[in-house]
UniProtKB/Swiss-Prot annotation:
It holds the Pfam family GTP_EFTU_D2. InterPro entries: EFG_II, EFG_III, EFG_III/V, EFG_IV, EFG_V, EFG_V-like, EFTu-like_2, G_TR_CS. This is Elongation factor G. The keyword Protein biosynthesis applies. CDD domains: EF-G, EFG_III, EFG_mtEFG1_IV, EFG_mtEFG_C, EFG_mtEFG_II. Keywords: Cytoplasm, Elongation factor, GTP-binding, Nucleotide-binding, Protein biosynthesis. Residues 6-288 form the tr-type G domain. Catalyzes the GTP-dependent ribosomal translocation step during translation elongation. During this step, the ribosome changes from the pre-translocational (PRE) to the post-translocational (POST) state as the newly formed A-site-bound peptidyl-tRNA and P-site-bound deacylated tRNA move to the P and E sites, respectively. Catalyzes the coordinated movement of the two tRNA molecules, the mRNA and conformational changes in the ribosome. It comes from the Bacteria. It comes from Legionella pneumophila (strain Paris). The gene is fusA. The lineage of its organism: Bacteria, Pseudomonadati, Pseudomonadota, Gammaproteobacteria, Legionellales. One of its GO terms (molecular function) is GTP binding. GTP binds at residues 15-22, 86-90, 140-143.
């Protein structure tokens, strides 16, 4: 029997790298009856982490999609179908998080009660804001030394700028953590240890916590009163709200991103996870609660699709994975209509038809074959040929292109070569497949040295790629030293003439252009404007000029790095009836750009990383001194239970080998995280050294 749409929840579980997200997901699968034995990350047996590298490293890399059913702790709901996308918390895999947020309706964000809101949590939060994803928070690890629930709540307010509404308070903390208090029911919940928390009982609130509970319940009532005028009147007249009224109000406020309900517990100790599942059903949206999906039709006009089985089919492919048994799996989210296996769909981004063979639904790494996928659901199709991440699949007669996802450019590159000649071809195939799965990973061949260069979002990202080549494709590779992906840009506007003329018997070559080259704001990218009037250059030659400029931009003008953020206007030129050709105009455009760019104050840009170091106070001086030596700019400092937190912006070029240096400077007691922040102009002495090397 198909589940009605209002009983669906498509959610992600997102968190910082060690907040205990995979353990939380595992418990969800256990309590919803999908897995009969609890898998622990510590034993390398977690169901969701199904790539060998994940089990070894104890972190989650691929986001697996899993389906489970839940009808409430007290069996108080109809059976709801929850699709969970497990997302990695390590910043090198931010792209995976970004992709999954794009197709989710809601998220559970897990925080560690000791570490609180960490830098990656802020990144995930910003990404969720960007896609307008409603969320609830689970403050996990309440049994750890130094657990402090209310500190995390105040960080959500201050660091993330959100409005948390506390729905539960912990009973005790650290070793003494016993259970939680439900502030809406005003009852304490104790989970039974014998059956891993499968059953629980409501008891009265401990006397010493009564006053605190009253105070936090008052905050909930205050928040709920904002929902409607009736509730506001009740509130002002001091009348009690019913449980249903509070929940209805909070649901609306959560879905519209005005508040964030906060739960607490310890997944590892089997306390609190079922209450979070109830929260998913009560406060997170179903596919019918979210706005209609927007897209454009083949003429570029905006169109909407409702989440309904009666609309034409549309879906977004959000992940490609290579499965050892079935080949290429394309994970997609269906937004409208119904897709049956055997149907033909249209990939509107690539303009190609695809026949859908088998359709699968995933439970971590086991799979179930299904006959159809309906609007609002998440599934995987086997063996699609042309689909890459971010493509739209739709009805052939009712074409729609859903919005594209934008992926960041890689910031780090290394050269790889196979250990044996025999592996050369295998390596090419392996890298091709991995690049198809992961849009933030690029592969190209360096034209001068003939080396294969792989680029990604960080050292760990590339290490894992090399590791996967070895594991999944049996290709052993030697890896060069990491190289920074520099860029070039221009600081001044210039006008430049470019002429390419060859006369040597027979047909000649003639191309002549005038370009205005000007800098754009950082991040604006390249823009080409055709301002030719009166046909001084025939329009069939214009694209060739654009192509010539872009090729020259790829090759750089001062140090061979790509030129970015430039606007080029083609405003004049001339042609020859016989000798002009696309080739001649392409060369003219390319040469003209190079000559002009050299006069336009070209500069070198380097990637700057946001670095956050957590260090015991004793080593603070050494850490700061070291960051300054690495050309770092300290942005701020604050206290945390683990010592001091230092935030700085440091050029990537200075950060290689930092983990080893930091370990030795602090006897292994400091930790750091880093993520890409922006490109900035490199100081003259640094730029000169890099240009000389080229």
């Amino acid at each position: 029997m198909a589940t009605p749409l209002k009983l669906y929840r498509n959610i992600g579980i997102a968190a910082h790298v060690d907040a205990g997200k995979t353990t939380t997901t595992e418990r969800v699968l256990y309590y919803t009856g999908m897995s009969h034995k609890i898998g622990e990350v510590h034993d390398g047996a977690a169901t969701m982490d199904w790539m060998v590298q994940e089990q070894e490293r104890g972190i989650t890399i691929t986001s697996a999609a899993t389906t489970c059913y839940w009808s409430g702790m007290d069996k108080q709901f109809e059976s709801h179908r929850i699709n969970i996308i497990d997302t990695p918390g390590h910043v090198d895999f931010m792209i995976e998080v970004e992709r999954s947020l794009r197709v989710l309706d809601g998220a559970v964000v897990v925080f560690d009660s000791v570490a609180g809101v960490e830098p990656q949590s802020e990144t995930v939060w910003r990404q969720a804001n960007k896609y307008g994803v409603p969320r609830i928070v689970f403050v996990n690890k309440m049994d750890r030394m130094g657990a402090n629930f209310l500190r995390v709540v105040s960080q959500i307010k201050q660091r993330l700028g959100s409005t948390p509404v506390v729905l539960q308070l912990p009973i005790g903390a650290e070793e003494e953590f016993k259970g939680v208090i439900d502030l809406i029911k005003m009852k304490a919940i104790h989970w039974d240890e014998e059956n891993k928390g499968m059953t629980f009982k409501y008891v009265d609130i401990p006397a010493d916590l009564k006053a605190t509970c009253e105070e936090y319940r008052a905050h909930i009532i205050e928040a709920a009163a904002e929902y409607s005028e009736e509730l506001m009147e009740k509130y002002l007249e001091g009348e009690e709200f019913t449980e249903a009224e509070i929940k209805k109000a909070l649901r609306h406020l959560t879905i519209t991103n005005k508040v964030v309900p906060v739960f607490c517990g310890s997944a590892f100790k089997n306390k609190g996870v079922q209450a979070v599942l109830d929260g998913v059903i009560e406060y997170l949206p179903s596919p019918t609660d979210i706005p209609d999906i927007q897209g454009v039709d083949e003429h570029g006009d905006e169109i909407h699709r409702k989440t309904s089985y009666d609309e034409p089919f549309s879906a977004l492919a959000f992940k490609i994975a290579t499965d050892p048994f079935v080949g290429t799996l394309t994970y997609f989210r269906a937004y409208s209509g119904i897709l049956k296996s055997g149907d033909t769909v249209y990939n509107s981004v690539k303009g190609k038809k695809e026949r859908i063979g088998r359709l699968l639904q995933m439970h971590a790494n086991s799979r179930e074959e299904i006959k159809e996928v309906r609007a609002g659901d998440i599934a995987a199709a086997v063996g699609l040929k042309t689909v890459t991440t971010g493509d739209t699949l739709c009805d052939q007669d009712k074409v729609v292109i859903l919005e594209r996802m934008d992926f960041p450019d890689p910031v780090i590159a290394v050269a790889v070569e196979p250990k044996t000649k025999a592996d050369q071809e295998k390596m090419g195939i392996a890298l091709g497949k991995l690049a198809q799965e992961d849009p933030s990973f690029r592969v190209h061949t360096d034209e001068e040295s003939g080396q294969t260069i792989i680029q990604g979002m960080g050292e760990l990202h590339l290490e894992i790629i090399v590791d996967r080549m070895k594991r999944e494709f049996n290709v052993e590779a030697n890896v060069g030293k990491p190289q920074v992906a520099y860029r070039e840009t221009l600081k001044q506007a210039v006008e430049q003439e470019g002429k390419f003329v060859r006369q040597s018997g027979g047909r000649g070559q003639y191309g002549h252009v005038w370009l205005k080259i000007e800098p754009q704001e950082p991040g604006k990218g390249y823009e080409f404007i055709n301002a030719i009037v009166g046909g001084v250059i025939p329009k069939e030659y214009i694209p060739a000029v654009d192509k010539g400029i872009q090729e020259q931009m790829q090759n750089g003008v001062i140090a061979g790095y790509p030129v970015v953020d430039v606007k080029v206007t083609l405003f004049d030129g001339s042609f020859h009836e016989v000798d002009s050709s696309e080739m001649a105009f392409k060369i003219a455009g390319s040469q003209c750009f190079k000559q002009g760019a050299l006069k336009a104050k070209p500069v070198l840009l380097e990637p700057i990383m946001s670095v956050e170091v957590v260090t015991p106070e004793d080593y603070m001086g050494d850490v700061m001194g070291d960051l300054n030596r690495r050309r770092g700019l300290v942005q701020g400092m604050e206290d945390s239970p683990a010592g001091k937190i230092v935030r700085a912006e440091v050029p990537l070029a200075e950060m290689f080998g930092y983990s080893t240096d930091l370990r030795s400077a602090t006897q292994g007691r400091a930790t750091y995280t880093m993520e890409f922040c922006k490109y900035a102009e490199a100081p003259t002495n640094i730029a000169e050294a890099i240009i000389k090397k080229q």
